[in-house]
Amino acid sequence: MMDATKYAPGYYPVPAGYDSWVKKDHVEKAPAWCSVDLRDGNQALIVPMSLEEKLEFFQMLVKIGFKEIEVGFPAASDTEYEFLRTLIEQDMIPEDVTVQVLTQCRDHIIRRTFEAVKGAPRAVIHFYNSTSVAQREQVFHKSKEEIQQIATDGAKLVKQLSQEYEGNFLFEYSPESFTGTEVDYAVEVCNAVLDIMQPTPDRPMIINLPVTVEMSMPHVYANQIEYCDKHLKYRDSVILSTHPHNDRGTGVACAELAMLAGAQRVECCLFGNGERTGNVDAVTLALTLYSHGVDPKLDFSDLPEICATYERVTRMHIYERTPYAGQLVFAAFSGSHQDAIAKGMAYRKEHGEHRWTCPYIPIDPHDIGRTYDADVIRINSQSGKGGIGFVLEQNYGYNLPPKMREALGYKVKSVSDHSHKELSAGEVLRIFEEGYLNKTKPLSVVEAHFAQVNGITATVTLALNGQCKVVTSVGNGRLDAVANAIQSATGMDFHLENYSEHSLDEGSTSRAASYVGLLWGDGSVTWGAGTHTDIIVAGIQALVSAINNK
């Protein structure tokens, strides 16, 4: 048995009155984004990226649109140091991108960091020390005053070296393990650092309040953010930043609520990479904003390519249900879901809708480089007529009547059920063609001639079980006349219950598709389909196919 008595909440709620953010129902603009993939993400990999891989990843982040990129902890390893020097010396940092470097508040590490970053066109020096109760007591064995001294000593050295080294430097301070720190004490430490750094509106400083470990529900963190928003000094000269992790599975919620509460900047990783359960997912955050009509200022229009590069370089797998990015996130197997999606797509097309409102799909898959045929409607034993019909129409142009879709659906689901697998669009087409299209055994129409005398007179040459027979009959139209001729020659008892047709292609050589449903004397219904450049021939082939399905 598990023993819950060994656990208790380890966070520090703020006093009442710091929850005005709850009146807001959505984030109205994108934050400043900072990718920490090359530091937090890289340090969490089983095999960290090589120099060449980091360069490729950096270029991908730039292409996506990140304007701030944490490129590493240059004092931690030669690879991290050389990566930063390569970016600077080979002039690989675009004019609108600022690199960020991480350093602990320790003299020799700060000095090594400035050695690495000298000559950078723009760089954020991100210095930090841990402030939580657990870290103070168990790791550092220091008092609050001593921990604050570490922060202020670090700030003094950072400020001093920024004046000695060549470069354009901005500054960021993080009270690491903020979520396990008394919030008033965290503010006290941050304000002491701000007093040293003396930010101004035109040279602001970043104060980053990390969810180093998720310890509370997201609204508790949002209240803490609002408290800091109200109590930090130099507020018009401070960029309030958040850095959520995902230990409780609510990293995205933490970031969103923090933005409602005053956070202006988010540090994040692609696909939620990072220590333990990962950092907050930049893709989910950005595309969730996008789904509310907010420009995220990040370009994920070719998300499959980004996914492929990420998986190759990091050797990590993107889970199939990862929001927006996973292989199955737009997939509908359920019959009722497929039917609603198919109808939603049809409604959108018929009404020329610009705003996206399709059931079950939060954003248009095309916007992020996904396709309807491969990503949305997926066929297995749970699928329904709507989805199966959608696959045939989207991929091959066949717009089956609803009742025929239902009949085909039973065949398709049976094949999937017995084979215990998902069916491709090609396999669905094969089942349709083999079961309904242009069937010529045991009955076929060899030729038919028509004359308009007291209606339509058809002279039809039939082949039944290899025997030919010529029959003449009258009907209200050509197809009715042929049907009457077949019944006269064979004694079959059926009624033309359903007929529809449409063009499969465009142009003078386009093919027509026809569908026929027959109601038989015993109450059963059979279906057939025909295709031909001559619409009359297509209709006759559909009729014959329906007869042959009896």
Give the residues covered by each predicted segment.
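Catalytic alpha/beta core domains of metabolic enzymes, predominantly
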Residues: 216-350
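Short beta-alpha connecting loops at secondary-structure transitions
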Residues: 209-211, 239, 267-275, 287-299, ...
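A mid-to-C-terminal "edge-of-domain" accessory segment
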Residues: 2-39, 293-472, 508-511
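A glycine-rich helix N-cap at a beta->alpha junction
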Residues: 93-103
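A conserved regulatory-domain signal marking ACT and ACT-like small-molecule sensing domains
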Residues: 451-458, 466, 472-524, 533-534
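Short, small-residue-enriched loops and turns at beta-alpha junctions
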Residues: 40, 44, 74-78, 132-134, ...
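Alpha/beta enzyme core
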Residues: 2-9, 33, 44-68, 84-94, ...
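Mixed-charge, glycine-accented linear interaction segment located at domain edges/termini
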Residues: 524-527, 531-550
